């Protein structure tokens, strides 16, 4: 498979993982390693910034994994910039998953504040990966603002409903000049494969793995599905017929004559 490149860094894995909702840090770490991921995002609000030996960080930081702090919980661009600067100081990284969702019930991203924050953070030297609505116009504006990727949602966070925004994702992928990472709503390995078959650069999964009966096995399933979907995309999927008339793969016409 082709390597994924974000801000000049190469990734072999196209499966990114979130770290919420696991029943223990040990299970979380096992799932991370089983998935083969090289990008793990963690909410700053879950980390004790004053404790360099925070137990959770011990289970996340590995040599081949890019830590991606996120700003989940902030309500506007001003709070996002403040949180980003704290993250850079605490973790020593310019990488940032930008999340601004002021409504705590649906956790839908605020498009206006997300674009505003992206513009400011890029100027401050951050590598910005914004979580956003599956809005083709917005995604293009974020790209023009200097975002390293766009991360449009497939469905609301934690719903496991799959690619409810599929048609919009197709447009976003088609017109993007930067990687497109489908984030939120991916609830089954088949959803991840579908996103990759569309041409998404990567997928970010959290809830579906964390709340599974066996998170480690589910991480392995998502790893396989993500790879399969990407391989299918690179191989070139056959066109779907626009009707239900069958076409034999091995015609017998000449044989019967």
From Swiss-Prot:
Pathway: Cofactor biosynthesis; thiamine diphosphate biosynthesis
Membrane-spanning segments: none
GO biological process terms, semicolon-separated: thiamine biosynthetic process; thiamine diphosphate biosynthetic process
Enzyme class: transferase
Pfam families registered for this protein in UniProt: ThiG (PF05690)
EC number from the UniProt entry: 2.8.1.10
GO cellular component: 2-iminoacetate synthase complex; cytoplasm
Coiled-coil features, chain-numbered ranges: none
Function: Catalyzes the rearrangement of 1-deoxy-D-xylulose 5-phosphate (DXP) to produce the thiazole phosphate moiety of thiamine. Sulfur is provided by the thiocarboxylate moiety of the carrier protein ThiS. In vitro, sulfur can be provided by H(2)S.
Xref: PANTHER family: THIAZOLE SYNTHASE
Designated name of the protein: Thiazole synthase
The organism of origin for this protein: Bacteroides thetaiotaomicron (strain ATCC 29148 / DSM 2079 / JCM 5827 / CCUG 10774 / NCTC 10582 / VPI-5482 / E50)
Gene field: thiG
